[in-house]
UniProtKB/Swiss-Prot annotation:
It catalyses: 5-[(5-phospho-1-deoxy-D-ribulos-1-ylimino)methylamino]-1-(5-phospho-beta-D-ribosyl)imidazole-4-carboxamide + L-glutamine = D-erythro-1-(imidazol-4-yl)glycerol 3-phosphate + 5-amino-1-(5-phospho-beta-D-ribosyl)imidazole-4-carboxamide + L-glutamate + H(+); L-glutamine + H2O = L-glutamate + NH4(+). This is Imidazole glycerol phosphate synthase subunit HisH. It is found in: Cytoplasm. Keywords: Amino-acid biosynthesis, Cytoplasm, Glutamine amidotransferase, Histidine biosynthesis, Hydrolase, Lyase. IGPS catalyzes the conversion of PRFAR and glutamine to IGP, AICAR and glutamate. The HisH subunit catalyzes the hydrolysis of glutamine to glutamate and ammonia as part of the synthesis of IGP and AICAR. The resulting ammonia molecule is channeled to the active site of HisF. GO terms for biological process: L-histidine biosynthetic process. CDD domains: GATase1_IGP_Synthase. One of its GO terms (cellular component) is cytoplasm. Residues 2-212 form the Glutamine amidotransferase type-1 domain. NCBIfam families: IMP_synth_hisH (TIGR01855).
Length: 212
């Protein structure tokens, strides 16, 4: 089994690769690539992302990878992480950027005036936060509802279709932090920075056949 981790220069790539390799129990060939053909030929695809969405979209197009992402999401198990997940939506408020349009909806910024417990919440949302599962999914196997994952983001998903939301978190209002449909699964948090729970989710992805 070949698992492509898309390298377009904008992700926490080596940490993602190392985390996947740490839970690779069945000898999968897990590799970084910026070759669109290699992405399309892979059996599974991981799409990390870190930084500003306009920069990520520009680099994705510069390397000719946007169409490869669109093609692989049609049928293969696909895992988007952080900005890699945000890019799946139609539009982001960050830099008024068009996304790949695979999911209906947009990516919006947290309000700067949010208050919880009498204190103003900082943007970006950074640190450990609980994730509440709203739908069952194979990638939740072995992960408790309310488990903590590691977040670093100023923008979050606003899906136009509620059925896309698989899990939510609070900051302080509820927001979608895992979205998915069919063979696509995408997280706002960084699985590669989320210790045991993040590794379990990556392990589940390697075992997943893309069916829900």
């Amino acid at each position: 089994m070949k698992v492509a981790v898309i390298d377009y220069g904008m992700g926490n790539l080596h940490s993602v690769l190392k985390s996947l390799q740490a839970v690779n129990e069945n000898g999968a060939d897990i590799f970084l690539t910026r070759d669109p053909e290699a992405v399309v030929k892979a059996d599974k695809v991981v799409f990390p992302g870190q930084g500003a969405m306009p920069d990520c979209m520009r680099e994705l197009n510069r390397h000719g990878l946007a169409e490869a992402v669109r093609e692989t999401t049609q049928s293969k198990p696909f895992f988007g992480i952080c900005v890699g997940a945000q890019l799946l939506f139609e539009h982001s408020e960050e830099g008024d950027t068009a996304g790949l349009g695979l999911f209906p909806g947009k990516v919006v910024r947290f309000a700067d005036d949010q208050v919880a417990g009498g204190e103003r919440l900082k943007v970006p949302h950074m640190g450990w936060n609980q994730v509440y599962q709203t739908r069952s999914h194979p990638l939740f196997a072995g992960i408790a509802d309310g488990e903590r994952f590691y977040f670093v983001h100023s923008y979050h998903f606003a899906p136009a279709d509620a059925a896309l939301t698989l899990a939510e978190s609070d900051y302080p209002q509820r927001f979608a932090c895992i979205v998915g449909r069919g063979n696509i699964f995408a997280t706002q948090f960084h699985t590669e920075k989320s210790h045991r729970a993040g590794l379990q989710m990556m392990k589940n992805f390697l075992a997943w056949d893309g069916n829900v």
